[in-house]
């Protein structure tokens, strides 16, 4: 015969119960890696992701890193605060979950940030920090390789000469402010939504491209 006795209500006991109950299910509902990045933190309908950067990263890496989820967490300051809270909470529930913090290289409140500054930042912060090598996400989306591929697929004429005159430093140049000129270089004459345009471009970044490997090396090292 087996005698049942009440469980002692301790944190350790509850942890054991959740590990047993969620063992297989947790791997299905919880990603192996969450990457917090800059962007609009308020969710859309049904909790959908509204931050541009997170949507772009999820588009690019959903196939090759299917167990990774990118989540927008506000601006630079909010990103640090919320990621610290997330790491503290998730590490107690999902021991196998990795949480990373990804920042644009323009993290110094508009001041110029060099590659050396980026390296120093990473050397002097926790290992879960990541910083883009290029200035911000537009410097990847507006890469010549991406725009050429997009134009070829859409039957548009890419003006390479105009592009080379405009983009002289793909890593450090502020390209977010020249979206309308990028659109013209791609031969787009109609009115388009800038955010939708960027999301569409992200669909053309694939594993066989140099820009993909450049971006992936910043995150999955």
Report residues per predicted region.
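Short runs of predominantly hydrophobic/aromatic residues within well-ordered alpha helices
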Residues: 33, 53, 134-138, 198, ...
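Residue-level recognition of short, structured coil/turn motifs
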Residues: 61-66, 152, 187, 206
